[in-house]
Curated annotation (Swiss-Prot):
Name recorded for this polypeptide: Ribose-5-phosphate isomerase A
Organism: Lactobacillus acidophilus (strain ATCC 700396 / NCK56 / N2 / NCFM)
Function: Catalyzes the reversible conversion of ribose-5-phosphate to ribulose 5-phosphate.
Pathway: Carbohydrate degradation; pentose phosphate pathway; D-ribose 5-phosphate from D-ribulose 5-phosphate (non-oxidative stage): step 1/1
Catalytic activity of the protein: aldehydo-D-ribose 5-phosphate = D-ribulose 5-phosphate
CDD domains: RPI_A (cd01398)
Length: 230
């Protein structure tokens, strides 16, 4: 599938998600190429239908700047109690709607917005669908003070760690941390791995989004749009 076709699919899925947004909502907005199409569709609804939102929170400066350029005011997560709806993308989505996220490095804020949402919808094209979580490195955000120990421990556990880099340097997250990508593929027991990472000192957050997503909007290459609801 070429990029032009992939972008067309992403745009179709994003427009369907944008039609779920209602005036008066507190909206969570994720990050990534598919979400950029979603934000464009929101802007169109704002202009054509006078869509008015109570508040918007987002997971990246890129999404924030795009929203503000379209006339939306963006709030901080601390300023809201709970989003009515959060729309985001996902790097991989399994049959049971579990996902791997964090390819763009914003996994910690993405998960914080997600857990403070009444409903979570992911928008993807069919290339992101997998039977079980696989085909994409699992991001783990780690504190610099203990990152070397974390890396060695992951090696000992057979998780195939790799430092995420930015040029010839280690990638630094919004919060000043590093990311270790785990190349274990497929992930044999996602809940077990999530529990292990949750209890590992020095791990800030990981990209396993389990039992969180309520609905996935999928754009297929044949032009059809599929809704998968948990």
């Amino acid at each position: 599938m070429d990029k032009k076709e992939q972008d067309r699919l992403k745009k179709e899925a994003a427009e369907k998600a944008a039609n779920m947004v209602q005036s008066g909502m507190i909206l969570g907005v994720g990050t990534g190429s598919t979400v950029a199409f979603f934000i464009d569709a929101l802007g169109k609804r704002k202009d054509e239908e006078d869509l008015k939102l109570k508040a918007i929170v987002t997971t990246s400066n890129r999404s924030k700047k795009q929203l503000e350029s379209l006339g939306f005011e963006v709030s901080e997560l601390a300023d809201i109690d709970q989003a009515d709806l959060t729309v985001d993308g996902s790097d991989r989505v399994a049959d049971n709607l579990d996902g791997i996220k964090g390819g763009g490095g914003a996994l910690t804020l993405e998960k914080n917005v997600a857990i403070n949402s009444k409903k979570i919808v992911w928008i993807v094209d069919e290339s992101k669908l997998v039977h079980r979580l696989s085909g994409f490195p699992l991001p783990v955000e780690v504190l610099p003070i203990s990152c070397e120990q974390n890396f060695r421990r992951f090696e000992q556990e057979g998780l195939k760690p790799q430092w995420r880099t930015d040029g010839d340097k280690r990638y630094i997250t919004h919060y000043g941390n590093y990311i270790i990508d785990l190349a274990v593929d497929p992930i044999p027991a996602p809940h077990g791995l999530a529990d292990y990472l949750d209890h590992t000192v020095g791990v800030v957050e990981h990209g396993l989004f389990l039992d969180m997503c309520d609905e996935v909007i999928i754009a297929h290459s044949d032009g059809t749009i599929e809704d998968k609801i948990k």
